[in-house]
């Protein structure tokens, strides 16, 4: 909304959304241990890698929009926390330096044991890691010197790009069906991938692919993004001809994440063939909204009853 208002040179809306973003940041900082990523309190702290990595992405984007140094500092601190682990918490980090890819969690949350071969590597941490690394690549200074620390506080542009490429390739080899474009939910060791498709995982793979395409110009990344988008549109959305809904708290936001990365695919990469499907999804969901509140549900093909209880995640997609 801020970017749109700025592009339209609407000073009033630009100021409003900038202030709103600042309030959201301040509120979340107060809620989540002042963004101390080494605090593993299970109520207000950090206890799983993918949640931290989403803040890496959000904070890096905040820096990209507003140029606030604190956002970049916290974004890089959270990336370090996930990649290398925490000396305070005692986990060894999400990155598997022996076999590649990113582990999903540390266990137990208190006094954890090192991750081992066979522990889960989920799409929900691997592809967001690529998105985070490439977003930082796009925003850190050009002239940085490579740190010699074992657990560096920052990476150079080249290091962020290399890390993004490495994790992406692991994901392609282990989580992508190269024929259909379906993204597996996870893989444990050498076992078969868990071929349960989620709009969320399709979306982050699309986003990771586009960022690498824009950074390198290599067409294979764009081809992969199109393959995953086609599977989402033609296979996952076949029943109702609009984006599907997955029940459960938080899962309603999957389509909002998908929408963000599809906008990149359509407008930054010229793949306008998806516009009819996206417009149909929007039109269907909006037509079935609760018209008294102008609130949409997550099941776009169903009418939302007036006054029905709806979570913010499910309402966010349209």
What are the residue ranges of the model-derived segments?
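Well-ordered alpha-helical scaffold segments within catalytic/enzyme domains
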Residues: 1-13, 54-69, 128-155, 204-218, ...
């Amino acid at each position: 909304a801020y970017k749109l208002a700025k592009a339209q040179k609407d000073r009033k809306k630009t100021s409003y959304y900038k202030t709103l973003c600042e309030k959201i940041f301040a509120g979340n900082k107060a809620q989540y241990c002042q963004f101390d990523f080494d605090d593993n309190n299970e109520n207000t702290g950090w206890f799983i890698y993918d949640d931290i990595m989403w803040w890496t992405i959000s904070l890096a984007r905040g820096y990209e929009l507003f140029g606030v140094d604190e956002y970049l500092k916290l974004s890089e601190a959270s990336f370090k926390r996930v990649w290398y682990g925490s000396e305070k918490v005692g986990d060894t980090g999400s990155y598997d330096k022996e076999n590649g890819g990113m582990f999903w969690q540390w266990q137990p949350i208190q006094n954890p044991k090192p991750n081992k071969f066979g522990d889960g590597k989920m799409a929900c941490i691997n592809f967001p890691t690529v998105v985070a690394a490439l977003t930082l690549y796009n925003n850190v200074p050009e002239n940085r010197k490579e740190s010699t620390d074992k657990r560096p506080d920052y990476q150079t542009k080249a290091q962020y790009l290399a890390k993004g490429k490495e994790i992406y390739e692991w994901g392609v080899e282990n989580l992508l069906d190269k024929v259909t474009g379906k993204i597996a939910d996870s893989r444990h060791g050498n076992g078969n991938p868990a071929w349960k498709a989620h709009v969320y995982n399709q979306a982050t793979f699309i986003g990771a692919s586009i960022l690498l395409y824009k950074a390198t110009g290599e067409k294979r990344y764009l081809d992969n993004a199109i393959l995953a988008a086609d599977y989402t549109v033609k296979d996952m959305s076949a029943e109702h001809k609009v984006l599907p809904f997955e029940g459960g708290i938080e899962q309603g936001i999957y389509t909002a994440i998908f929408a963000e990365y599809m906008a990149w695919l359509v407008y930054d990469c010229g793949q306008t063939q998806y516009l009819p499907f996206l417009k149909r999804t929007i039109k269907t969901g909006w037509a079935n909204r609760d018209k008294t509140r102008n609130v949409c549900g997550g099941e776009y093909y169903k009418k939302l009853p007036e006054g029905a209880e709806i979570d913010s995640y499910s309402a966010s997609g349209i």
